Amino acid sequence: MKRTSVLYLPLILVYIVLYGPLVSCNGHRSSSSQEQINADSIAAIEKAHQEDIRQLPANIQPSVADMVYDITQFDTLTSGRIDYADHIMWNGEQKNQSSLYDGQDGWFTFRGTSLRNAAYCGRIDGIPSRIDKVWTFQTSQDYTQTKLGTWGGGSGWTGQPVYVKWPSDRMQQFRQTSPALTADFAQEEVMVGSLCGMVYFINWETGKASRQPFNVTNPIKGSISLDPTLNGNLYIGQGIPKVAPMGQVACNLNTHKQTFFSGYDRSAWLAWGAFDSSPIRIGKFLFWPGENGTIYKYLVLDDNRGLRLHTTLRLKPNRGGCAGVENSLCVFKNYGWFGTNNGHVFCIDLNTMQPLWHYDNKDDIDATIVCEVVNGTPYLYCGCEVDRQGMAGVCRFVKLNGLTGEEVWYNEIPCKKLNIGNKHFDGGLYSTPLLGNGDCDSLIFANICQRSGNAKDPKPCRAEFTAIHRGTGQVVYRTQLPAFAWSSPVGFVNETGQFFVFTGDSQGNAYLIEGKTGRILFSEKMCNNFESSPVVVGNELVVGSRGSEIIKYAIR
C-alpha cells in the first residue's frame, strides 16, 4: 500500500496545480462542489492508470506439465518483479515503466514496440507510385574465413536499424562526453549492426557517418536495440564466432565504450551461443533470449554501468531436446512470448520467469511473434518454416490466445525446402508478419517462402506476399514474388486510410503493394539483396543489404 500511495502523489499534485486553478477561476461552483470535482477527476485518473499497469495473472496452464525447465536467480537482493509502481527518468521526466516504447520518437528495438507489431507505420500522401533512393552508406567488408563461411558487410537477417530523434539535453551530453562524434552528428540518427562486426551510426538526413563505428569484432546478424530510456545504452548481439567467445554486448554511447560482455555460458543447455534476438527492456530489466536455449533477465544498472545478471530460464518440452531462440521476445504487460527452433511457442511470467504455457507449432520458428491486444486480451500470430519436416511440409500460421495458449485458428500452407548446390533454403515464414492498418485493419501480411518452388524452376526460390484475415485465418490473396523473401514488410497509410506495403526480396527487388488488393504498384531491383528489415519514418525508410550497403528510400 505504501508503494501505491507514493505512485499517485505526483499525479495528485499535477492535477491540483494544473487543473485546480482552472476550475476555481470558473466562479460558478461552490468550494464543496469543486472539491468533489477534483476528487472525482483524481479517482478517474487513478482508475485509468491502474487499468494500464495492472499485471496479468500468473496462471499456469496444464501444458506446463509437458515441460522441463530450470529457473536460476543470481541476484537475490533485487526483487525480480516488474514494479509498475516505480517511475524512471526519461528525457528529464518521470515515465511509467509500462510504456517505455509507447509514444517514443524512434524505433529502438526490432519492429519498434514490445508487441513487435511495427505500430509506427509510415505516412504518405495519395497513391504511391515509385520508390526513390535517397542515399547509400557503405560499410566495411570482412571476408575472414569462419567455420560458417565468410560474411562480408552490409546487414543480413534480421538486421533492422535503430532510429532515434535525440532530445536536446541528450545531444548536449554527447557533445560533452563522447569522443566518437563526427561533424555530421545530428538530432536524427540511424544505428545498424553489420555483418562485418561493426555498429554504424548514420545521420538520417545526409547519410554520412554521425559517429565513429563501434567494433564488436564478430558478425552481427540480428537487430541491435537502444535502451528506450535514452540513457545511452546500446545492446548488441553477436551472431558468428569469428573470434571466440561470442555473446551479448552493451555499449555506452556517452563514452563509446563497452560496459558489458556476457561471454560463453557454460551452464547453457546448448553450446551454440549466438544472439540474433533483439533484446527488450521492461521496467528496470532487460530480457534477452539466446540460441543456447536460455532466456536472460538482466538488471539495467544506473549511471550506464552496464548490466547485472538477475535470472536465467532454461526450458524444453518433455519430448525433444532443448532448442535455441532466434526471434525476439514479444511482451504485453508481464507476459513474454517466444518461439524455438524445434517449433514450440512458450509463454513466461516476466516477474518470476515461470513458464505459464507452451504450444507445439511443429517446426522451426524464426519469425518473431506479433501481438494484437483486443479488449484487453492479447492475441498472438506466429508461423513456422519447413525445416525438420523434410523436403515438403506446411508453414503452420496460427493465432493463439496469449493468456492461455489456446488455438483460435490455424492455416497450414504447403511449402517446400530446396537444396541448391551445397545450400538449402527452408520454406515457410522467416519474415515477421505485419498487422494491417487503415482499410486493411482486418488483415495480417506475411512473406511465405517457396510455397510451390522446386529445384527445376528457373526461379526456384520464390515467395508469396500473403494477406490473411485476422478473424478467420483464411488467405485473402497471394501476390507472387520471384525470389525468397526474409525481409519483414512495413506499412504506409495515406490521408484517406488506404494502406500500402513496402517489402523486398533476396534478389534486391523492392515492391510497393496495395494492401487491400495485393496489386503491385511498383517493383524494381534496387540493391544486391534484401534480408534485413526496414525502419520507417514518415514517407522514408532505411534498410540494409548484404554486401556493403545501408540505403535510405523515399516512397513517392
Question: Model regions: which residues?
Answer:
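Hydrophobic membrane-insertion alpha-helices, especially the h-region
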Residues: 11-19
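C-terminal motif of bacterial Sec signal peptides marking the signal peptidase cleavage site
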Residues: 21-24
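Intrinsically disordered, low-complexity linkers and terminal tails enriched in Pro/Gly
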Residues: 30-33
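Bacterial N-terminal signal peptides that target proteins for export
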Residues: 2-10
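Bacterial signal peptide processing site
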Residues: 26-28
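Extracytoplasmic/lumenal domain signature
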Residues: 35-96, 102, 117-157, 162-276, ...
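Short glycine/Trp-rich loop-beta-loop segment that forms part of the substrate-binding cleft
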Residues: 107
